[in-house]
A protein has these predicted regions:
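Membrane-interface helix-loop-helix junctions at boundaries between adjacent transmembrane segments
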Residues: 3-94
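Loop-to-transmembrane alpha-helix initiation sites
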Residues: 39, 92-99, 120-121, 157-163, ...
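Alpha-helical transmembrane segments and their membrane-interface exit regions
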Residues: 45-55, 71-76, 104-107, 127-132, ...
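Central hydrophobic cores of alpha-helical transmembrane segments
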Residues: 67-72, 121-130, 186-196
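Internal active-site segments that recognize and position negatively charged phosphoryl groups
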Residues: 78-137
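Glycine/small-residue-rich hydrophobic helix-like segments
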Residues: 140-205
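Internal/C-terminal transmembrane anchor helices
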Residues: 238-258
Length: 261
């Protein structure tokens, strides 16, 4: 105050970019990158996200990942007719899609490695991919607007675990330094929890929209449990006591897959 210096709103821009990367307004034509259709959805979601950063706090940090919380609330309140996460499937293999994967992967690996958070992304993906593989092997499938029939088997697994949208989630959302559980062991338990709860919630869904929202919701739940996760992380023996039963129960629940009608 009174310094005459205008601060660059880097944090708000990052939150807004997170909202923009994930959100899609139905009816927008593919390739119309400069469309202003549904601009108020983006603006309201970004504003809610930024506001939550300063209102819902635990000590000196926000309790929830701001863009993640804003997105989940927007999707649940507005529904798929007004606000929809980007499709999990981004099209047939092409030069453009290859470049997209390369940019996301290279950027994610470099940034998370420099922040010392790469292990969180790797642990999350390993657990999530394994549990999702169990669901796929047991026959779980979903409906999607880009598929004429149910998405199942290898197609289901690869679409859910290797989607550019999921890569954005694991590289740039769950690794937010301000909302990751503190401590090495706490951070690892945090990654396992997001992956396990995410896989469980995803296995209960039969539509692509619900699948995407379920994964995002898992991070909201785990961030809310962060104090307990950090407490467990402070005592190494508790990690196995908590993580193994949770993963085991999840595997059992995955054994009863839901199929799209």
């Amino acid at each position: 105050p009174g310094s005459g210096v205008v601060a660059w709103p880097a944090s708000a821009l990052l939150t807004g970019n997170g909202v923009a990367l994930i959100t899609r307004v139905p009816g927008t034509e593919h390739g119309d990158w400069l469309s202003t259709r549904g601009w108020y959805v983006f603006a309201a979601t970004a504003a809610l996200s930024v506001r939550s950063k300063y209102v819902i706090r635990l000590g000196d940090r926000p309790l929830f990942n701001p863009s993640n919380l804003g997105l989940v609330l927007a999707f649940l309140i507005l529904g798929s007719g007004i606000a929809d996460p980007q499709d999990l499937w981004w099209g047939q293999p092409s030069v453009g899609l290859t470049v997209t994967y390369a940019v996301i992967a290279a950027g994610g690996l470099v940034i998370t490695a420099r922040l010392g958070l790469l292990r969180i992304s790797l642990i999350f993906w390993s657990v999530f991919a394994s549990l999702t593989g169990i669901a796929a092997a047991l026959g779980h499938d979903i409906t999607a607007r880009w598929s004429l029939g149910p998405v199942s088997g290898w197609t289901y697994w690869s679409t859910v675990t290797l989607s550019p949208e999921v890569l954005i989630f694991l590289f740039f959302m769950i690794t937010d330094p301000r909302t990751v559980a503190r401590g090495r062991r706490g951070a690892e338990l945090y990654a396992i929890a997001v992956a396990t709860i995410g896989a469980l919630l995803v296995s209960m869904q039969t539509t692509e929209f619900a699948t995407k929202v379920a994964l995002l919701t898992a991070l909201v739940i785990v961030c809310g449990l962060r104090p307990a996760i950090e407490a467990c992380g402070d005592r190494p023996g508790r990690i196995a006591m908590v993580a193994l039963p949770v993963v085991s129960v999840t595997v059992v629940l995955l054994a009863a897959p839901r199929q799209a009608s």
